[in-house]
Amino acid sequence: MSHLVLTPGTLTLAQIREISRGKVTLELAESAIADINTSAGLVQQVLDEGRTVYGINTGFGLLANTKIAADDLQLLQRSIVLSHAAGTGQYMQDATVRLMMVLKINSLSRGFSGIRLEVINFLIALVNAGVYPCVPEKGSVGASGDLAPLSHMCLPLLGEGEMSYQGQLISAAEGLEIAGLKPIELAAKEGLALLNGTQASTALALEGLFNAEDLFAASSVIGAMSVEAAMGSRSPFDPRIHAARGQKGQIDSAAVFRHLLGGESEISLDHVNCEKVQDPYSLRCQPQVLGACLTQIRHAAEVLGTEANGVTDNPLVFQDTGDIISGGNFHAEPVAMAADNLAIAIAELGSIAERRIALLIDSNLSKLPPFLVENGGVNSGFMIAQVTAAALASENKTYAHPASVDSLPTSANQEDHVSMATFAARRLRDMSENTRGVLAVELLAAAQGLDFRAPLQPSKAVAQAKGELRELVSYYDKDRFFGPDIEAATDLLLTASYNAYLPAEILPSL
């Protein structure tokens, strides 16, 4: 478990990845406290002066013009949390909720939200205790923020809802007891500040980003394995080709392949006098395809890194002037578009990998035994494993349709254009799982192909990757129950061990 001293607005992608992948304890930097207190004081000043300001002493959405009496302000905060906790579907994973909470703490602590330190410390205490609110996956359109998910996240502050602790569902009362907390009463604006924001969609999109990075690394390593297994040419990775085009992602991807394949190997030397003029695109154009995916991953990283540190509450409190201004930072269009781009990248990584599998099992193209097995006919080898990969790759093509182009008005047309960011981000987990499955099949196929090339040896990095797999899955000498092999290869990919094969500067969060 790592410990993070949080200076609001300074989270790095590496820190966010660590929070996403493991438990963390938080401590708020002392430098943040003054801004939090000043911001909360300005909200109290509005009430003391009897002014009417949206989000502080008014209704919400279409009811924004309804002024709320001072005696009803605490009830209003409770009511908005309870009424907006209207999500549905399965609960998000604890890791997702943990990240969502840290992002909300990060945003609230910047001093633009008019929320008391007591409320922020309550959320920090839950994170530190490892007690997480139960948040349904569905119910947000990504504007006005992620209202339903964040409402469920905040129910325990009121002593309501369910929580998760060490994999078990418990009541909010039990969860608060574990964390040493008691329910609190929210003051003016605090309910809206807690619920308004893009932290649910951003957390899901960041998880998608980290999965996409892992898949890019795996695609590079396994793609290099397939080049060796198919006795492919190294010339398509020549740096002069990629410099002539000038696409940064492509240039970097080609460099990764040169790093993985090395200058030469026994396999490549044996291939010198090959009569084949060119390799199929799935081998030859890997830098062009994977490089384009890398560009989308990097762009999404920039957008999501900014969003993770941004303030997406409404209205915002500006300490230098005392102004409280209503805007639309809750609209998650940047997150939705970043997630859409990640979806395309994840789908393409799986699509080209499936084509490499098809190449390897086709003896006319690879010059390997049909379906990568001896005694074909009696043995079917990788025949149906490739069908599985095709099914997964095709499923992702449907998932990759952009979500951000959809919109459905809500709140009696007051909220008449929305981002659909939460779905855009949420589907990335399923897409990543599908592409991981495709790559698992390719990993098995490439290793099998390399075994058929023996005694010729591949590059050092490719041999190492093959060796890691062979510690888990043996050579496929005859037909056997294939499912466990795919599962073992998938588990290997889930360790993200292939990230270490790439230079550190390639992926944004590493």
Swiss-Prot record:
Compartments reported by the entry: Cytoplasm
GO cellular component assignments: cytoplasm
Modification note: Contains an active site 4-methylidene-imidazol-5-one (MIO), which is formed autocatalytically by cyclization and dehydration of residues Ala-Ser-Gly.
A Pfam family that the UniProt record links to this protein: Lyase_aromatic
InterPro entries associated with the record: Aromatic_Lyase (IPR001106), Fumarase/histidase_N (IPR024083), HutH (IPR005921), L-Aspartase-like (IPR008948), Phe/His_NH3-lyase_AS (IPR022313)
EC numbers for this chain: 4.3.1.3
Signal peptide: none
Protein name: Histidine ammonia-lyase
